[in-house]
């Protein structure tokens, strides 16, 4: 069993592992237009770190724990169509929305500023 962590970002909780990539909607307070590919990121909202033998749970977050990663690219999610119609009023409105996503890869899971679990090359 590989080491993994549970983080909170973009209003979601994600189970992350080193070497895997994830799509996040609202990346904390970071603006996706200002972040280019290969930008380094640190995520401090780590809820849990699980090793092969130990589980560390924070209340609500673990102190000294962070996730190191880098941004691969930003992209748009699939289009959602919103159609509003009022019957017998001849009022119709059709809108579409594409959510901005950021794809990032987890390089390592750190606890107490030590790299515990790194990406396997």
UniProtKB/Swiss-Prot annotation:
Q: Which domain of life is it from?
A: Eukaryota
InterPro entries according to UniProt: bL21-like (IPR028909), bL21-like_sf (IPR036164), Ribosomal_bL21 (IPR001787)
Which keywords does UniProt give here? Chloroplast, Plastid, Ribonucleoprotein, Ribosomal protein, RNA-binding, rRNA-binding
Q: Name one GO biological process term.
A: translation
An example GO CC term for this entry is:
ribosome
Question: MF terms per GO, please?
Answer: rRNA binding; structural constituent of ribosome
Q: Where in the cell is it found?
A: Plastid, Chloroplast
Q: Which family does it belong to?
A: Belongs to the bacterial ribosomal protein bL21 family.
| Function description | This protein binds to 23S rRNA.
Q: How does it assemble?
A: Part of the 50S ribosomal subunit.
Q: What is this protein called?
A: Large ribosomal subunit protein bL21c
Look up and give the organism this protein is from: Huperzia lucidula (Shining clubmoss)
């Amino acid at each position: 069993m590989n080491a993994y962590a549970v983080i909170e970002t973009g209003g979601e909780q994600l189970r992350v592992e080193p070497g895997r990539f994830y799509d996040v909607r609202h990346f904390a307070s970071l603006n996706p237009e200002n972040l280019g590919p290969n930008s380094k990121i640190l995520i401090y909202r780590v809820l849990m770190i699980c090793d092969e033998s130990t589980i560390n749970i924070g209340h609500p977050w673990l102190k000294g724990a962070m996730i190191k990663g880098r941004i691969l690219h930003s992209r748009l999610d699939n289009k959602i169509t919103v159609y509003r119609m009022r019957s017998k009023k001849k009022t119709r409105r059709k809108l579409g929305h594409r959510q901005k996503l950021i794809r990032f890869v987890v390089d390592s899971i750190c606890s107490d500023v030590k790299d515990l679990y790194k990406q396997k090359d």
